[in-house]
């Protein structure tokens, strides 16, 4: 029979060993875990996507730390054995361990070394487990009083690190199994990925070949179209050039025809005037008139804007351009008396004055050369002095002389109207 302790000791401590051990707080020492021989870290060559997949696949359930109670749990004690309640390992520590495992497995040579080390550790742990079991069996059969109890206490304290080692060994085995499975999955996935990559590469090469063929055909068609467009443009340019040349030639012919018609009209008008008036002086001065006609033609070619001066309608344009519109407004209906009205009035009322002044017949012969013939008449009176100098000044003084003569004639016509129908014409000297 084991010896009993004193009453004072019994009141302080629980009676059974299991109750005493369960009441004692268990010190958690993570330093006791065996650290694996870590290899030199290499640069990570794995893709970030694969790492994220691995991290997502191994989800760790959250474990809440259980508070160690100091109460006596009699139900948990069986056959005098004490169940040691340890604080579970926190989540961060498990993640750190797995990170170390992943880093170690990245190297090619690191895998073999780890396998050898883990095998040796597993053997040692199994031997320790067997020793612990034997010790427990022996202690159960011992009934040696206080010494036995003291020995059991010391044994219990020694058992604690053994139990921690056992749990570490189990975790290591689980980790190894998981790693093996992951490697197999990775190998299978890599094979499938390589096959998919090969298929994609072949499809891409076929598409590239088709695109090159399309580009070549499009390039040939584009060249043909460009050449056709160039030929079409050249033909259109030739046609446009031919049309422009035709228009230029037609314009020149029209100009020549108009010039010829003007010359014919001038000559016809002169001949009619010569026949009606029957003046010998005009026949004597035909050579001079031809000179004036040639000079007038040169002026026409030099200044095309002066053709209106030599036509019947040119007088109206001169009056408008030279600022004599006010005269036309004030004096009334001068345009009626300018062209045909003037000739009619002069024929009816002032033919005697025209016959008296033979030197100014040329004014009524040519519409645009009245100033020239006036100067010619003066030349006859003065003895034909310096004919060349006057011819040079004719172009400048043509318009002014014509306008002066017309203004004088219009003033005369007004006088006739005011005085009534008088038979005495006013001279235009």
Swiss-Prot record:
Provide the induction entry. Up-regulated in differentiated trophoblast giant cells.
Q: Write down a Pfam family by its short name.
A: HMG14_17
Q: Which positions does the record annotate as the modified residue Phosphothreonine?
A: 29
Q: Which residues cross the membrane?
A: none
Record keywords, A-Z: Chromatin regulator, DNA-binding, Isopeptide bond, Nucleus, Phosphoprotein, Transcription, Transcription regulation, Ubl conjugation
InterPro entries, alphabetized? HMGN5, HMGN_fam
Tissue expression, as annotated, is:
Expressed in trophoblast giant cells.
- Composition-biased stretches, type Basic and acidic residues, lie in 92-101, 109-124, 153-195, 210-387, 413-429
- According to the UniProt entry, which residue ranges have a biased composition of type Acidic residues? 133-152, 196-209
Q: Which GO terms describe its cellular component?
A: chromatin; nucleus
Name the SMART domains for this protein. Answer: HMG17 (SM00527)
Q: Where is this cross-link: Glycyl lysine isopeptide (Lys-Gly) (interchain with G-Cter in SUMO2)?
A: 64, 98, 121
Subcellular localization, as worded in the UniProt entry: Nucleus
Keyword Secreted listed: no
Region ranges (Disordered): 1-429
Regarding protein family, the annotation reads: Belongs to the HMGN family.
Q: What is known of its domains?
A: Specifically targeted by its C-terminus to nucleosomes in euchromatin.
Task: Give the protein's biological function.
Answer: Preferentially binds to euchromatin and modulates cellular transcription by counteracting linker histone-mediated chromatin compaction.
Q: Which PANTHER family does this chain map to? A: HIGH MOBILITY GROUP NUCLEOSOME-BINDING DOMAIN-CONTAINING PROTEIN 5 (PTHR23145:SF6), NUCLEOSOMAL BINDING PROTEIN 1 (PTHR23145)
Query: What's the protein name?
Result: High mobility group nucleosome-binding domain-containing protein 5
Gene source species: Rattus norvegicus
Gene name of the encoded protein: Hmgn5
């Amino acid at each position: 029979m084991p010896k009993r302790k004193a009453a004072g000791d019994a009141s302080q401590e629980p009676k059974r060993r299991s109750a005493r051990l369960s009441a004692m707080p268990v010190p958690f020492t993570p330093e006791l875990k065996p650290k694996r021989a870590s290899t030199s870290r290499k640069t990570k060559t794995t893709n970030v996507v694969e790492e994220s997949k691995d991290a997502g696949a191994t989800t760790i359930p959250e474990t809440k730390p259980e508070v160690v109670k100091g109460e006596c749990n009699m139900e948990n004690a069986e056959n005098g054995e004490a169940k040691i309640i340890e604080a579970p390992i926190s989540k961060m520590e498990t993640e750190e361990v797995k990170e170390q495992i992943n880093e170690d497995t990245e190297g090619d040579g690191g895998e073999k070394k780890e396998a050898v080390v883990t095998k040796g550790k597993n053997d040692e742990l199994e031997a320790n487990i067997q020793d612990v079991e034997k010790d427990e069996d022996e202690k159960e059969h011992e009934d040696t009083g206080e010494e036995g109890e003291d020995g059991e206490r010391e044994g219990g304290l020694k058992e604690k690190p053994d139990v921690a080692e056992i749990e570490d060994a189990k975790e290591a085995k689980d980790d190894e199994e998981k790693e093996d499975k992951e490697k197999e999955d990775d190998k299978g996935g890599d094979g499938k990925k390589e096959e998919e990559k090969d298929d994609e590469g072949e499809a891409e090469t076929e598409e590239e070949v088709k695109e090159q063929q399309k580009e070549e055909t499009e390039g040939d068609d584009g060249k043909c179209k460009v050449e056709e467009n160039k030929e079409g443009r050249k033909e259109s340019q030739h046609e446009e050039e031919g049309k422009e040349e035709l228009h230029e030639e037609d314009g020149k012919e029209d100009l020549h025809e108009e010039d010829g018609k003007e010359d014919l009209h001038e000559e016809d008008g002169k001949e009619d005037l010569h026949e009606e008036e029957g003046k010998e002086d005009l026949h004597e001065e035909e050579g001079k008139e031809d000179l004036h006609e040639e000079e007038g033609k040169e002026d026409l070619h030099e200044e095309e804007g002066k053709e209106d001066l030599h036509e019947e309608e040119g007088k109206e344009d001169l009056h408008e351009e030279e600022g004599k519109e006010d005269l036309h407004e004030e004096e009334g209906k001068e345009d009626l008396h300018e062209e045909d009205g003037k000739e009619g009035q002069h024929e009816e009322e002032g033919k005697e004055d025209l016959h008296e002044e033979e030197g100014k017949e040329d004014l009524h012969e040519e519409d645009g050369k009245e100033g020239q013939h006036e100067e010619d008449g003066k030349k006859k009176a003065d003895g034909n002095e310096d004919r060349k100098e006057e011819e040079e000044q004719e172009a400048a003084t043509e318009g002014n002389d014509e306008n002066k003569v017309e203004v004088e004639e219009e003033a005369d016509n007004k006088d006739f109207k005011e005085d009534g129908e008088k038979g005495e014409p006013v001279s235009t000297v």
